Amino acid sequence: MLRSGAASASSGGGRGPSSSLSSVKRSKHDDTRLPEAYQQERPPWRPPLHPTAARRHVPDLFPTKSGQPEDDMSQISVRKGFAPRTYVHNEYFCAHDAIHTRLLSPDALDTLSDWMDEVMQRRRELDRASIATNQYKPPSRVTLNDAKLANYVKDLADPTVPLMRLSRSVPHGFRGEKLFEMLWVGGALPSTATAATTTVNYFHSRIAGPPSASSASASASASASTSAPRKSVDIPRAVWFIRALGAAELSSLRNKSAATIIPEITSNLCAWMAKQVAELNLVHTAESNSTATASPAPVSPSTHLPRTPSAAPSSLSRSVAAAHFARTPSNLNPASSPSLAPAKEVCYVLQNDADEERWIAKWSYSLSLARHLHAQNLLDRSVLVRWIVDAFSASNLVQLPFLLELVQEVLLLVLRRRCFVKPFLTALLVQIPNVDARLDPSSSGGLRTKLVLLFRIVCENSPESLISPRLWFEHSASLTQLLNELNAETPLPLSHQAFEFVEQTVRPRVDRLLLRPHSGNTTQNASLETQETLSSPLQHHLDIQALDSFDMTTIDRVFLQNTSATHRYAKHDRDDTVWATRIDTILTWACTDRRSGVVRQYLAATLIEKIRFGVPWEESSEETDQVSLPAFDLEHNTTKTRKINVEPMLIKWLGDVETSLNQKLDESSTQTRVSLLATVDVGAIVVLLGELARRGVFSYTKYLQRLIARGMTAPSASSATEQHQNPDGSVQTPSSVSASRDSLHLRLLRSLPLYDQPASVYQQRRQAIYGDRTKETYEDAAQRRALRQLQSFLPFAFAQEVQAEASRIAVSPSPSTPDPVHALSRLWSASRFVRCRLFRSELLPAVTARVERLNGDQLSQISAVLVMADDFEGLAQLLATLLLRPLSDNLARAAFNMVIEYSLVWRSMDIMATLNQLVRQQLNHSSSIRNDRQAVMASTTLLRLRTLIENVPSRISASALDPGADHDALQQHVQALRPNVDALLDRFAKLTRSSVESDGSIASSSTPVEGSDMLTPFRSLFVQPDAMSDEMIERTIVDSVFARSDTSLVPSAVRLIDQLYLEASLEIDERHARWLSNLVLSIEQGTHSDASMKALLSLLTRLIAHGTLNLQLAMDTFLLPYLLSSVRRLTDPATRNTEVPMHIGSIVSSLGEIFASSLGETVPATSYEDMRAFGAQTKLLFAQVNLPSLLRAATCLISAFDETSTVPASEKAQIESFCNALLQSQPMQIAFRQEPRLCILAIKDTCKSMWGCNPSRVIDLAMACLDPTSLLLRDVGTIDAASVKNRLDGWDTAVVATELVEIFERLQLVESSFQTRADSKTKALASGIFDDLFVQLPDIGAQLVRDCQSSGLVSRFTDIGIKILSDKVKAASTDADKTPRRMDNSHKGMTNFGPDDGADAPAQAKTAADAAKHGPCVGEQQVESTLRSVVRMCEQQHSFIFNATDADSCAQLLLHVVTSLEDALGSMAAASHQDKVARLVTVLHGSMTFQLMHLVLRFGCLWNGTMRALALRLVKALLELTRQAGEKTECGGSFALLLDSLSFVLDELPPTLLSTCLPELETQLQTIELATQERSDKLQQLSFRLDNATTANAWLVASSAGAALKKGWFTSGGLNPWECAEYLEAPPAANPAAAGAAGAAGAAAGGNARAGVVETGRSGVNSRAAVESPGAVTVNDAETCNSLPGARTGWTGKLWLNTAIPLSMLGVRVTRDLVPNYASPASPGGVSVGSNDASSQPWTTGGGASAIGVGTCSAMDMDAKEALAALPMFVESERTYGERSAGEPAYSRDLRRGLLVEPNLPCRTRDERGETSQEPARATMDPAGAHTSVTSSATHDPSHVIDLTWDADEEMPLSTHPHHPAVATTSRKRRLSKRD
């Protein structure tokens, strides 16, 4: 380099004269001002090249001097040349060639240019931070009109206009949405008239407008073509302008601070963006072919270019992608949506290409502006995040993708606070089901996947947000579904852990807040306690309700599952005393006359058998693997193990019954149980004990021996005489029983049947009853006479083969068939013992031997005898015998009908599954032999059994009749077919009659054909017969019979329709429904005679009897619609007196024939087979799914025979008789006891549909038949609480709840003059029955509230419950005050807890509850029972907020809660540590305080304006309890429960009261420090504020993101949004007094806003002066600052923007001028931090000349490796260097060179006990900030320094680090290589 420099000098010397001449000329012109002499000095900012370089040395410049080596002209120098001395010792050659080659490269100039640009930019970056304080001047404000304001914004949008000119003044009053809209438009806002023109102008260069737009008008086209398209303000200039506006506002308004300006800017921006989102609304439009498909999406997102260069392309692409998605599903066309609506939903903005591009560009500009404002801390995070969450929650399907992008950008902020994450989680649970319902997965575009992913992120990162009672109450189904989806997608171990977390952690805590018992607690002790706490009245009511339901699943759950499923082998199950009361209830229910039906005895016997052996009751109508007949096998009980000995209970119950029967009525009237047992029917006892004996539960032999031992079998003379005089040994009525002087046991001994007993037992029985009698006994004579009558009544069963064959040929019995009641009088007068022995020894063997010769009617006649004798065991044996063999069609129909008709008996006997399987075998057999008729009957039987067993509707989907064009066309075809069908029907009827009249044994040529051939003539009327033609034939046949009024055509029509039914498909019910509905219309529209109606009803009756027509279908589509229309004309005053023929009498006659079997009539109307068919069909009408239709028909009949009806008196009597018999029948009584509320509602709804009908009177008439003791039969004014309580005895409790609903509704519907009296009556009645109805029988109270349709009545009951609860709480607290040391006694012995009470919370709760028993716990038990009752009552409202109006009682309860919490805090103030833990557990689990609070929070009337102080006290008390629990390590469970309660309170507080509590809450949260960081984080999530400012550790300041990321040019520290380096004065250094003030909203302005003084705290904004080193500004820097031009002199370099950048974006970047400086006392600006959470450490600021001083916290939770990773990183530039060494601090130089300094970590010391502990190192700073030292509780080891420059093999000598006084000794083996 020297040689090239000399050559240049010599070459320049050749041009010396010219050079001197130019110097002379320059001296002449500049003689007055000579230039300064050049000084060879480097600039002050340039670091030296090398530590050994001269002070004034300039690189590559060597001036001549005397004695220099180049002047040596010796011989050696001349011969060998000059060898220059190397400037650096390790440089051995010249760099001229390398430099010359580099300069000759093609890109040399570009490279040099880039280097110079970087140099200039770097100097500008460094000089920007050195602007003097007096140069920060805010601009002045001016008020501009609209035109000038538009011009100002236009200039702002023009990049060529310098900001210097715009900065001279700032518009005043320019704010709101108008500000952002003008920034977007880039000038004046377009008016309404020119809005379209502006849009066209803007997109003129991009989009070709439609042809109509160009030809609209000449002026418009001219203006559009001449006006230039507007351009939005660039994002950097827009941010500068907004900041300038805020700075001007701060400087002009004294009372305004950044805390108010920033939220205002944020609110305006959110409102502006909300208007844009609102443009994407969905509009319903008519579907058309031209718009059926969606608008085409853009080809690629690249067509939508950003309007400003600063718009981020990534955000724009996301917006375009979202827009592309939002276009397609917004149409919701049939191709992409399952909706069948004729209209579609479209978004007009996205349907138009121009509007779409305008909206997307504007939205992209909004997002870019929002991001930059947020980066500059010009937006309030809390306001912004809250708006985004609210907008996301209220968005539709089109808006959802755009708001989803916003949510993803602020998701981390959302997860930080519960006030954001809870509404966001609620929004997800609403939006995901909405997307599922509106969009299919193929068209959702991954939207649902994104939503589910967000749900998963929320659940994983903020699991505490799941603990929300309202969330689980309102969105339980969606939440459970999504959690199950997440578990399915997660691998098995992780999914199992997630499932356990939800079930074991989340659900118990949520159930605690909802006051629900957690289902997961299934321990034995808990179940025993539950059974012990179940009151006897409630258990009695539940047992009777289960028995009345006749639902085997319910009976199994109430009686068997509690004892056999979970604790099958518990001692409690084998305790006979526990079951004594329940067995007594079962026996009484089975035999009392307060219930009806022999089925009760069979159900009770089966249930007692299962209880005795401890087996569950399993019932199913589905197919089983094999056929088993356990009910017919009497040996199966011998293999079972007895668990309960029920025989002593039976004997005791029989004794009580006998005592009750022998007492007088007046004596037993005062005793409830005695009066109840007096209603027991002895005949029912005989059936029950006989069934128990057959099942092996009751031993007849032991019973007989017991009676013989007690001498109760010796007959008296009077009794023997009485036997001959009155041979009725069965004694079927209570009156005859009481007339007998024999004991009940002796009568039972005579009547009980014997099943498969040996002859010795019969002989012993004869000896016990008749003694030594050798003659024929009374029973033998009765059996002989009854057998003779039975053979006479059933000759086909006992006759010879010829006679049986003759009886089989008969189609129907002769009209002179005797009445079975009179024909078998001897049989009915005999005892049950005689009847059962006669059936099993004579009847059943004879029938079984001749079963092939029987027909359906004969089988039905035999079954009628067995049913009248209540011998269902014999009938079951007969059915099993029949179904086990192939049957004829006639016999199979009768057998199937008996299976359906007595299905309830078979279910009670637990043989339904066996019979069901036998029917299924018949179906398989008939299908295999292609017997279609029998297969159809078997399949129909299985479907009807499923309806009866499982309450599943049968396969009927009959649609309403549509009187449209299709119906009219079909009717025209039917009318056209009538003549031909009439002729064919007459011919077929004539053939049928001739075949019947002729002898059956002689084949007649006139006999009609069978099968499909009979339909051939009818089908020949059509060219191509099909299903529609069959329907026309069927309808024409029915119309012909109806129009011709000829009953002789009915048999032929039945045969034809039956054949059509047999050949029809599964849609036969729909076909029948159509022509039945057509019949109703034709009857209503025309006048038909009674003969026609009777012929039609006869046809329908025969079709029902034949099984062709479904009675349920006929009721729904014909009978009920016709009755409703007829009765409406009767009740309507306008049509009541019109002369319209009514056929109600004919319908009632047909219904009487159909319901004869169900009403208990023994004389058949037509035949026994028809009775069985009608009975099977009517049984379906009494099923729960079909019962409303039957009750509606009964309601119509009641209205028809009412006093105001115009029906003739003769018909009224007939209708009333049938209706009363129907409502009093056994099936109706059973159905009414099953669902009393369903019956009342069906009657009431029917009455409401008929104008002029009185619902109350109709209900009273119906209840007189259903329940003669009903309260509704009394006057409402006479009903008091005592009468209601008398009915609440368990037997009528469910009915009472239904009656009370009707009573309260009637009290509300009184006249206005009696309204006050009715209200008083309602209140008195509700108050009087509240305890009995809601406390003792909570299920009935809950049912009452559930059935009430009046919200006012529900709120009244709720108010009464709250008042009673408040009174009991007050009484309990008064009793507790009498014993002030109650709490001290309650927690004695509770001081020895484990490390964490969260793992043993149930045990501690039980301990606390046991300890509380030392005090007066009676009041607390009453409070608890009342509380549970109120909760159960309120939960029936099906809303999270309970409807109530008693605000005073609610306030009293809340005041009690707050007082209890404050008392608990006071008692814990002076207690010891263990005492505090015990008291805390007692407050949580040993009292009702928190349960009361959780209940009161759900009342809607609780909060009002007067509750501010009480709400604040509640929050403070809960927060203090939470703090105390969090500070104790062993109180983890208590802390979680208290945190849940506090969160619950904050969630339910209204905004007006929440604003009162927030200041105190935020203040306490800033000062609370808990035991663990995890608890602190959980508690901090309750805060409602987001820190808008950032700490110096996490943020940097740079001119742009590119400068920071690419060049690494930035300054550490947060950005003050109002510290505008261009116009605001720089704030001074913070003082210690101001260091503690926190700026929560981003920056808190000081007293002098003009000077820009900002007070910052540990989480506030850190100004630039606060992070600069005290020695950063030197003398040379000051001179440089003074030499720079000011803000008013036009320096343009200062107009670069400040941008705050998170440090995480930079990563770890090490450059020459930016060296990562880890915290160390050796560094000039270093700090020592022991935790990553900088916001949780106390900050200590020194004097004005000091840098930031940061205190440290304990590092006991981190080991050495974690502590090293926890050290924060700071980046220092040349401006902040302290002591320099070659341009960088010595510490940074050593770190770069590889000198590894061990950080100051906590050292391990040993205490006196020998345990190892950790003591943290702390960095302290004196007030002057002169030096920093490290102090610790123990002496540290010296830090070892490894110098990689030491190459000697020997050991490195000890040296002292210049800034780190640490000595290190090491060898070469420990040196790091370059790779390391």
Swiss-Prot record:
Keywords: Activator, Nucleus, Repressor, Transcription, Transcription regulation
A GO MF term: transcription coactivator activity
Chain residue ranges for the region called Disordered: 1-75, 291-314, 715-737, 1373-1405, 1801-1876
Pfam families tied to this protein: Med12, Med12-LCEWAV
Annotated Basic and acidic residues bias: 1373-1387
Coiled coil: none
Subcellular localization(s) per the UniProt record: Nucleus
InterPro entries listed in its UniProt record: Mediator_Med12 (IPR019035), Mediator_Med12_LCEWAV (IPR021990)
GO biological process: positive regulation of transcription by RNA polymerase II
Keyword Transcription regulation: yes
Tree of life domain: Eukaryota
Biased composition (Basic residues): 1867-1876
Entry keyword Transcription: yes
GO CC annotation, single: mediator complex
Compositionally biased region (Low complexity): 1-10, 1394-1405
Known role: Component of the SRB8-11 complex. The SRB8-11 complex is a regulatory module of the Mediator complex which is itself involved in regulation of basal and activated RNA polymerase II-dependent transcription. The SRB8-11 complex may be involved in the transcriptional repression of a subset of genes regulated by Mediator. It may inhibit the association of the Mediator complex with RNA polymerase II to form the holoenzyme complex.
Family statement: Belongs to the Mediator complex subunit 12 family.
Subunit-structure text: Component of the SRB8-11 complex, which itself associates with the Mediator complex.
Protein known as: Mediator of RNA polymerase II transcription subunit 12
Protein source organism: Mycosarcoma maydis (Corn smut fungus)
Phylogenetic lineage: Eukaryota, Fungi, Dikarya, Basidiomycota, Ustilaginomycotina
